[in-house]
Amino acid sequence: MTTDTIVAQATAPGRGGVGIIRVSGPKANQVALEVTGKTLKPRYAEYLPFQAEDGTVLDQGIALYFPNPHSFTGEDVLELQGHGGPVVMDMLIKRILGIDGVRAARPGEFSERAFLNDKMDLTQAEAIADLIDASSEEAAKSALQSLQGQFSQRIQTLVESLIHLRIYVEAAIDFPEEEIDFLADGKVSGDLQAIIDNLDAVRKEANQGAIMREGMKVVIAGRPNAGKSSLLNALSGKESAIVTDIAGTTRDVLREHIHIDGMPLHIIDTAGLRDASDEVEKIGIERAWDEIAQADRVLFMVDGTTTDATDPKDIWPDFVDRLPNSIGMTVIRNKADQTGEEMGICHVNDPTLIRLSAKTGAGVDALRTHLKECMGFSGNTEGGFMARRRHLDALERAAQHLQIGQEQLEGYMAGEILAEELRITQQHLNEITGEFSSDDLLGRIFSSFCIGK
């Protein structure tokens, strides 16, 4: 339990019908007494005036008191539900901050206290922020699944399996004369493979959850007048970019946030790439390259009426040479309605080639399907959970150590090395739920939350 009491507005700033102020800590009951003038009945809504120190009424509304440990934070919690005007909220917060021992909450501090008081684990705490930030119905459902503990349960199942296997392996190590027989009887190998398979399934679901949370950054790049802005408009379903026959119309970066079957995409249109003499256009081209360097995928736009080539190295070798190897590329042969080429995905080599008409929209559905496939997005997120980059990293490290352990078991019957790899694997999994997390990591996570959460 912490010794200080915190206060913050729990509802979004600005005007609204209702505004909620949340107080958590050992002085929550004292705050209730001083602001409402009475001792509140636990877990009971009372309509009361909210008073200044001199007894004048600042507002009136509903007061709710939740004594520890049966509250969101696990501490004594007070909620004041008043009128949602910013002036009223500010007056009430100033009134509460005037009470000795009460301070303003840091961003995410209520959720942090809930985590520290074992009211939720770290993935559930993160899911609160993800639920608030959800940009689609599918993302909200996934965040809610994580908040309800689905991701945590999957991790806990893995950890329990690891613990049982570690006990067996370490017992074998304690009896050196029988260690080889223990390790070679097939149980260890079978249990280890089952854990690896289970972890692979969790990683696949977590990758879907990360896509749902973070989206995919797709940059449309190419020479001027290749149809980049027309493709942005076709994908977004609206006239986001100005389209003309004049080369260099787009001089800055244009962004649109869209969804394809629930998968969030950040589509970025960039200035046409060429040797420009105009200073403004030069700046736009440099910004284009900056965006390309940060992309998950680049759509390399080609005007199909100017070349028959399909290999980007034949079309523009300098572009291919400058593109980072880690970034996937799809070649888009635009204006297929004018060249008479067959629309859609023409082959699935690297890079994939798609023929379409950004102007008419023909072939654009094939591109949408292709983008989902590039991210490994199935679209079947019912029951899925939300995941973050740190979760994927921890799962990846866990998988690597399991692989090392399996190699040591199968190749050398090295029980001690296997036991150590299992221990490290468990440590990485515990980082996800917060059972083993540094204070620095916790600080970074909760500081990104809203104040009042």
Swiss-Prot record:
What's a Gene Ontology MF term here?
GTPase activity
InterPro entries, per the entry = G_TrmE, GTP-bd, GTP-bd_TrmE_N, GTPase_MnmE, MnmE_dom2, MnmE_helical, P-loop_NTPase, Small_GTP-bd
Q: Where along this sequence does the record place binding of Mg(2+)?
A: 229, 250
Supply the alphabetized keyword list: Cytoplasm, GTP-binding, Hydrolase, Magnesium, Metal-binding, Nucleotide-binding, Potassium, tRNA processing
Q: Which GO terms describe its cellular component?
A: cytosol
Where K(+) is bound, by residue? Answer: 225, 244, 246, 249
Q: Where is the TrmE-type G domain?
A: 215-376
Signal peptide per UniProt: none
The EC category is hydrolase
Cofactors per UniProt? Answer: K(+)
Cofactor stoichiometry and binding remark: Binds 1 potassium ion per subunit.
Which Pfam families does the entry link to?
Answer: MMR_HSR1 (PF01926), MnmE_helical (PF12631), TrmE_N (PF10396)
Where does the chain bind (6S)-5-formyl-5,6,7,8-tetrahydrofolate? Answer: 22, 79, 119, 453
EC number(s): the record gives 3.6.-.-
Give the GO terms filed under biological process for this record.
tRNA methylation; tRNA wobble uridine modification
- PROSITE patterns per the UniProt record, alphabetical: G_TRME
* Functional summary from the UniProt entry: Exhibits a very high intrinsic GTPase hydrolysis rate. Involved in the addition of a carboxymethylaminomethyl (cmnm) group at the wobble position (U34) of certain tRNAs, forming tRNA-cmnm(5)s(2)U34.
**Which family would the database say this protein is a member of?**
Belongs to the TRAFAC class TrmE-Era-EngA-EngB-Septin-like GTPase superfamily. TrmE GTPase family.
Q: How does it assemble?
A: Homodimer. Heterotetramer of two MnmE and two MnmG subunits.
Q: What is this protein called?
A: tRNA modification GTPase MnmE
Organism the protein comes from: Vibrio campbellii (strain ATCC BAA-1116)
